[in-house]
Amino acid sequence: MALLQIAEPGQSSAPHEHRIAIGIDLGTTHSLVATVLSGQSKVLQDEKGRVLFPSIVHYAEQSIEYGDDAKPFITTDPKNSIISVKRFMGRSKADIKFQHPYVLVGNDNEMPAFETAQGRKTPVEISAAILNQLKIRAEESLKNPINGAVITVPAYFDEAQRQATRDAAQLAGLNVLRLLNEPTAAAIAYGLDQENQLSSDRNYVIYDLGGGTFDVSILRFSQGVFEVLATGGHTALGGDDLDRLIVKWAKKQLHIESLDDHEYAAFLVAARTAKEQLSEQQSVYFKALDHKLELNRDTFESIIQIALDKTISVCKRVLRDAKLSLDEIEKVVLVGGSTRSYAVQNVVRQVFNQEPLCTINPDEVVAIGASITANQLIGNSQDGSLLLDVTPLSLGLETMGGLVERLISRNTAIPVARRQEFTTYQDGQSAMLIHVVQGERDLVEHCRSLGRFVLHGIPPMTAGQARIEVTFQVDADGLLTVSAQETTSGVKAQIDIKPSYGLSATDTERLLLEGFQHAEEDKNLRHLQETKVEAQRELEALEQALKNDAGLLDIQQLQALHTAKDQLQQQLQSNDIDQIERAVAQLKIHSDEFAALRMNQHIDHALKGTKLEDWSDSQK
């Protein structure tokens, strides 16, 4: 898709000016930066020829070390050596349940800060420090300032995690052209859009097992457009977790009950080394401090089986979501350093019945794809395919009765906007609370609250007459804006969804699974709640009518109406929908009679004092 260029007035670029854009893979364990030079994507090196930048920051009292310079301090000063900060991004202190050596401060429901030798540092600040180092590497390598950057994030990052990433980039002084899902970046890097242009639709699986996150996406390429059909994963499953499983095995083999922070850090380093060596060798040694254990591929596979099983279940679920069979998958692409593992590759072969594609360095493929996208977005390339990412969970708002009205369904391609009209519940209602939720259930109490705002200034009207247009808009970065406008007066309010913390991996999995498991139950509950809300509305309208016109009824009529009303109110305390519907029908018999009397009275009042010839003349 060629992008139209719109320059600032008086600031138009020269027609052949090349602007510098970079792609950044902000990884859990390693980060990379790449750019496009002379039409070719290139991963940028440091002065020692290294492309991988360890995502580590060490805070000493008088200095700060980054990347490889910070690595030695993981074992000697673990509390001040922040690794895998990506796992903390956009998450609350209460969400962080995995083992770590850090002192975290802050309230449980807020994003924490790390207590370091240089004071408190938030995950956003630490990520910004890593991004700044990558920016410096790019500027030194390219001898030019950077005009823009595309930064990749896991496909399963929610709004809070994406916003935290944007905040970190802004703090690092980067102009963010776009946040790009990592699997989508891999598809671009492999040029899957360039294959067999005349063939029919093609489906690809991107299996991305990085240092701290796992994502599986199914992409369809059709008529020049990439669309993510389905995506799934874990925000806390990756190479770090495989390392922890090896440490757990080693502790058991060595009969060690617990490790202090220094020992645990040393065991993690030994686990990572052994894991990487097993990609090339059948058997290696786990060496930590004065301990030494033999570890072969079979044992390693059994150790990490629990993690592999999780990836298998996600793969199967994503295939179901996409409504595809294995025969309909063209290729499987491996992404992330953890996919070098023989055990991981073997699982992929078994699940998809084909040899996975891994001709591009799995550590570099995401950065390469990000650089290609950055080159397109900055205006250097007129070629490219439109990439449509998807929303990982459904988005909606709360309606009367605690029900969820979905405006954007899970796996909807983004960017996307959806509008829907709502109305008031009570006469004279002048404000409306908009409660935005995320999840797959039909009741608000089972979904995740994203935010609330109030639309004030609704003109007083009879219930049901006001028209409130609510718009949900998700941009290309997956960030949500919700607005509400009353159509007659034009009053408007909106909220940008930037939750104070994100979903834990467990919560994300729970929201999806509960949506599947309780689908029938939720359908029945929705029907029950909708019936109750409608019945309550009828009762309130009837109550108001009786205040105004009860004199139209004789004693028997009034008594029968009150009896039917009381019976319905009593049934509303139960969850028996059949009894409620019968009570509604019984009340309707008497309320319809009352409504007819009221209508006749209003007609009489309207015609009172009007002559027959006046009425006849008005009809001519």
UniProtKB/Swiss-Prot annotation:
<dbReference type="InterPro" id="IPR029047">
    <property type="entry name" value="HSP70_peptide-bd_sf"/>
</dbReference>
<dbReference type="InterPro" id="IPR043129">
    <property type="entry name" value="ATPase_NBD"/>
</dbReference>
<dbReference type="GO" id="GO:0005524">
    <property type="term" value="F:ATP binding"/>
</dbReference>
<keyword id="KW-0067">ATP-binding</keyword>
<dbReference type="GO" id="GO:0140662">
    <property type="term" value="F:ATP-dependent protein folding chaperone"/>
</dbReference>
<comment type="similarity">
    <text>Belongs to the heat shock protein 70 family.</text>
</comment>
<dbReference type="GO" id="GO:0016226">
    <property type="term" value="P:iron-sulfur cluster assembly"/>
</dbReference>
<protein>
    <recommendedName>
        <fullName>Chaperone protein HscA homolog</fullName>
    </recommendedName>
</protein>
<dbReference type="Pfam" id="PF00012">
    <property type="entry name" value="HSP70"/>
</dbReference>
<dbReference type="InterPro" id="IPR013126">
    <property type="entry name" value="Hsp_70_fam"/>
</dbReference>
<keyword id="KW-0547">Nucleotide-binding</keyword>
<dbReference type="GO" id="GO:0051082">
    <property type="term" value="F:unfolded protein binding"/>
</dbReference>
<dbReference type="GO" id="GO:0016887">
    <property type="term" value="F:ATP hydrolysis activity"/>
</dbReference>
<dbReference type="InterPro" id="IPR042039">
    <property type="entry name" value="HscA_NBD"/>
</dbReference>
<keyword id="KW-0143">Chaperone</keyword>
<dbReference type="InterPro" id="IPR010236">
    <property type="entry name" value="ISC_FeS_clus_asmbl_HscA"/>
</dbReference>
<dbReference type="InterPro" id="IPR018181">
    <property type="entry name" value="Heat_shock_70_CS"/>
</dbReference>
<dbReference type="InterPro" id="IPR029048">
    <property type="entry name" value="HSP70_C_sf"/>
</dbReference>
<comment type="function">
    <text>Chaperone involved in the maturation of iron-sulfur cluster-containing proteins. Has a low intrinsic ATPase activity which is markedly stimulated by HscB.</text>
</comment>
